[in-house]
Amino acid sequence: LNDGKNPFYSYDDFIKFRDHSSPYTHPSVNWCDELMNKNSTTQSYNLNATGGNKYAQYFISVGYVGENGLFKNPGGDAHDTNMTFDRYMISSKVNINITDDLTAKVTLMGRIEEGTQPGGTGNGYDDILSSIYSTPSNAYPVTNPDGSWGGSQSFNNNLLSQTINSGYITDGARDVLGAINLRYDFGKLVKGLSVRMVGSVTSQNRSTTKQTKTSEVFDYTIDKDGNDVYTRYGEKKTQSNSFSSVSTYRQMYGQLAVDYERQFGKHKFKASVLGDT
């Protein structure tokens, strides 16, 4: 058994892990409970308005969705590094009877999204969530007796430090759509004839801002004389700042259509000629 080698843990070690009598040298940390709340909150608001008269009709919708993160944030960075998500939306449609023959439909839509997450080791919450399940409960204490971050040679990125003291990453999205549809009825000249002109502009942008940093950790032990010994691992790096435009998309679209629709007795005829760009 054990190839004749001495046991890695003694009976005294197991007792200390179990009764938490020496939490700094024999930690037993439930990382899920230490880092994450059991629940979170989501907010959603929407306001709609409609109205008009025989000349114009409108519809407007304004909405907001907000989600708070599951990470605990007992203090750390001045900027809240918890996972959050905010979305603002607005859409409007207006139908206008310019003349008896000419009508216009205008559509405007906009959306702004922003998500924040802790920096972790540079890749955000993915680093933290994967580390929660791969870090043993006895790997290191959350903090040492002197308040420094706990760690070891094998685990040189403290999980709580990654959550509240690693800076933050912000992902942003901006979407705008504008469209107009004009229709002229030539029925007074040629029954059933009309012309449509459609134009739209779409703009989408995705960006990421990273303001991340790392902290050193210390492996705490007690030497044979009873003195505290702190061995440093990892590297303390000041906050870096970077901005990247992940994607930018713009599209302009135009269409011209000539429509003809007539009813001849029991027969209905409909034809369209389209051109777009």
Predicted region positions:
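Extended hydrophobic secondary-structure segments that form protein cores and membrane-embedded regions
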Residues: 194-202, 270-276
